[in-house]
Structures are given as structure tokens and as C-alpha cells.
Amino acid sequence: MAALQQKIRIRLKAFDHRLLDTSCDRIVDTAKRTGASPVGPIPLPTRRRIYCVLRSPHVDKDSREHFETRTHCRILDIYQPSPKTIDALIKLDLPAGVDIEVKL
């Protein structure tokens, strides 16, 4: 019977893809430095949210403006993490615009 591999799955979300990519690079570098084997970043589909707003507060229903937000997502898997890896990831300082979900 095969031994179960321990895995940490990190899911990152951000509106700015450059900020997201630099955060992924920092996590991968930290994992490699501490002896774990990272897989990724794996890009997930970008979610587009479009808002339609009337330009005028009173009349002119035909005049509308569209705004859009794009949410970029990435997944990182870290196999065989040591306690040193987990401590380094907890102490890692990442930008404020990145949402992080961690599953063990």
C-alpha cells in the first residue's frame, strides 16, 4: 500500500495579475529553500464581473457605462512540507491585495 503524501494546497486570488505572480514566486522560492517540492503555480480561469451603470442620475436611459473587475486565481501545491517549511510560509510577508486560502 502506498504511503500517503502530505500536501499543502494554497489558492491565491487578486485583481492585479502582476501582484499575484510575484506572490506565487515568493511562495515557491520559500518552499524550495526549506526542502519541500512545490508544484505550480497553476493558473485558473479569470473571472470577469461586469457592472452596468446609468451615466445620468435623472434621464437618458440609453446612456450607460460599463465597469469590469477581473479576478485572477492561481493554485500552488507543496508536497512533503517540513515544520520548517510551514514556519517559513507563516512568517512570509505578502502584499495586501492578495487573498490566500490554505488547505492542509
Swiss-Prot record:
Q: What PROSITE patterns would the database entry show?
A: RIBOSOMAL_S10
Q: Which UniProt keywords apply?
A: Ribonucleoprotein, Ribosomal protein
Q: What's a GO biological-process term for it? A: translation
Q: Name one Pfam family in it.
A: Ribosomal_S10
* Any one GO MF annotation of this record: tRNA binding
Indicate whether Ribonucleoprotein appears among the record's keywords. yes
Summarize the protein's role.
Answer: Involved in the binding of tRNA to the ribosomes.
**Classification via PANTHER family:** 30S RIBOSOMAL PROTEIN S10 FAMILY MEMBER
Assembly mode:
Part of the 30S ribosomal subunit.
Q: Which family is annotated?
A: Belongs to the universal ribosomal protein uS10 family.
- What is the recorded name of this protein? Small ribosomal subunit protein uS10
Q: Which gene encodes it?
A: rpsJ
